[in-house]
């Protein structure tokens, strides 16, 4: 059964989709990346619905959700509140949480409010420390051709991260550390226009992946990961922006955690190795 609709949250309405093939199992709710992206690239996770309901939603300001102009809404605590409001609206008394990239920042911040009924949390290509993420990207940058490094550094220094040469350099970075597929799935190429909201990304992260200037600049929950006591799974790609070393470090700080690396992937193993990704995630959820 497929359901879609809108949920009222602080600041506007968010669009959600629910996939449910047999009505059994504890639901899993998926938190997309960004900040300011949408759930469309994660739609392949609906395959998990053979065992449990799967809920995807576009965070406020993104995708099909409302796009309010109030920039004070683009704060981590407001997105945490939004997740709580969605759970309440959908009567998700018990739930698994799967966050990807920025979605793991949101998942961790939410779990640290000690909500009831969270059966497990999956940190997929996690960002749980903005300073660590920034350090890792500086190291990743050094693995690229020298001219690409120089372009990115020059554009950051000159404030020209909106230029065509910066975009071209970022594309090279992406082919190394974000999505390494030569040919993208056809459904991914048909992405909806305007699904991203660059304003949210700029306010919360900044104009560049490599230097955090937004309001997440000081986010670091590593010292609190010991407080996440439900079962957890940390995953990343071998060539991920969310490096295996840092991801394993987060896992080591979290009780009841498991760690898995997708050997052929960068930051999007759910697209780069979809069968393996679904198998690992599905097995973990079914073990709870």
From Swiss-Prot:
**One cellular-component annotation, GO:** cytoplasm
- Start and end of every AB hydrolase-1 domain? 27-274
**What Pfam families does the annotation carry?**
Abhydrolase_1
Residue ranges that the Swiss-Prot or TrEMBL entry lists as coiled coil:
none
What the record says about temperature is: Maximum activity at 40 degrees Celsius. Stable at temperatures up to 38 degrees Celsius.
Q: Which reaction does it catalyse?
A: Release of N-terminal proline from a peptide
- Which Gene3D superfamilies does this chain map to? alpha/beta hydrolase
UniProt KW Cytoplasm keyword = yes
How its function is modulated: the record gives:
Completely inhibited by p-chloromercuribenzoate (PCMB) and heavy metal salts. Partially inhibited by proline and proline derivatives with proline as the amino terminus. Enzyme inactivated by PCMB is reactivated by incubation with 2-mercaptoethanol.
Phenotypic consequence of residue 101 to A? Complete inactivation
EC number of the protein: 3.4.11.5
Instruction: Provide the alphabetized UniProt keywords.
Output: Aminopeptidase, Cytoplasm, Hydrolase, Protease
Name the active site residues. 101, 240, 267
| Stated pH dependence | Optimum pH is 8.0. Stable at pH 5.5-7.5. Most active at 7.3 with Pro-beta-naphthylamide (Pro-2-NNap) as the substrate. More than 85% of the activity remains between pH 6.5 and 7.5 after incubation for 15 minutes at 30 degrees Celsius and it retains 50% of the original activity after incubation at pH 7.0 and at 30 degrees Celsius for 30 minutes. 50% of the activity remains after 15 minutes preincubations at pH 8.0.
Q: Does the keyword Protease apply?
A: yes
Effect in UniProt of substituting residue 62 to S: Activity same as wild-type
Task: Tell me where it resides.
Answer: Cytoplasm
Gene Ontology terms, MF aspect: aminopeptidase activity
Subcellular location, principal? cytoplasm
In terms of NCBIfam families, this protein maps to:
pro_imino_pep_2
Subunit note: Monomer.
Family statement drawn from the similarity comment of this UniProt entry: Belongs to the peptidase S33 family.
Record function comment: Releases the N-terminal proline from various substrates including at least dipeptides Pro-Pro, Pro-Gln, Pro-Trp and Pro-Tyr. Also acts on amides (Pro-beta NA) and oligopeptides including Pro-Leu-GlyNH2, Pro-Leu-Gly, Pro-Phe-Gly-Lys, Pro-Pro-Ala-OBut and Pro-Pro-Gly-(Pro-Pro-Gly)(4). Higher activity toward small peptides (up to three residues), but very low activity for longer peptides. Has no activity against p-nitrophenyl acetate, poly_L-proline, Met-Pro or amino acyl amides other than Pro-betaNA (Pyr-betaNA, Phe-betaNA, Cys-betaNA, Met-betaNA, Leu-betaNA, Ala-betaNA and Z-Gly-Pro-betaNA).
What is the protein name stated in its UniProt record?
Proline iminopeptidase
Q: What is the lineage of its organism?
A: Bacteria, Bacillati, Bacillota, Bacilli, Bacillales
Encoding gene per record: pip
């Amino acid at each position: 059964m497929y359901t879609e609709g809108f949920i009222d949250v602080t600041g506007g309405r968010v669009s959600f989709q629910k996939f449910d093939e047999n009505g059994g199992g504890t639901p899993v709710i998926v938190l997309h990346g960004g900040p300011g992206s949408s759930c469309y690239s994660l739609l392949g996770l609906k395959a998990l619905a053979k065992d449990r309901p799967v809920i995807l939603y576009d965070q406020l300001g993104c995708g099909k959700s409302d796009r309010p102009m109030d920039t004070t809404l683009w704060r981590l605590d407001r997105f945490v509140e939004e997740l709580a409001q969605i759970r309440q609206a959908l009567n998700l008394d018990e739930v698994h949480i799967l966050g990807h990239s920025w979605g793991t920042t949101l998942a961790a911040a939410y779990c640290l409010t000690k909500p009831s009924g969270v059966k497990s949390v999956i940190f997929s290509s996690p960002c749980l420390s903005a300073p660590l993420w920034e350090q890792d990207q500086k190291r990743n940058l050094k693995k690229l051709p020298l001219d690409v490094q120089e372009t990115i550094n020059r554009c950051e220094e000159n404030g020209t991260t909106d230029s065509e040469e910066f975009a071209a350099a970022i594309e090279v970075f992406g082919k190394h550390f974000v999505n390494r597929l030569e040919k993208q799935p056809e459904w991914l190429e048909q992405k909806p226009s305007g699904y991203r909201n660059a304003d949210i990304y700029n306010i919360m992260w900044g104009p560049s992946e490599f230097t955090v200037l937004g309001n997440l600049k000081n986010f670091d929950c590593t010292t609190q990961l010991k407080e996440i006591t439900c079962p957890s799974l940390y995953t990343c790609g071998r060539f991920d922006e969310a490096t295996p070393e840092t991801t394993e470090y987060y896992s080591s700080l979290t009780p009841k955690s498991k760690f898995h690396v997708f050997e052929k992937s960068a930051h999007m193993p759910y697209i780069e190795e979809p069968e393996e990704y679904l198998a690992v995630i599905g097995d973990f959820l079914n073990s709870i």
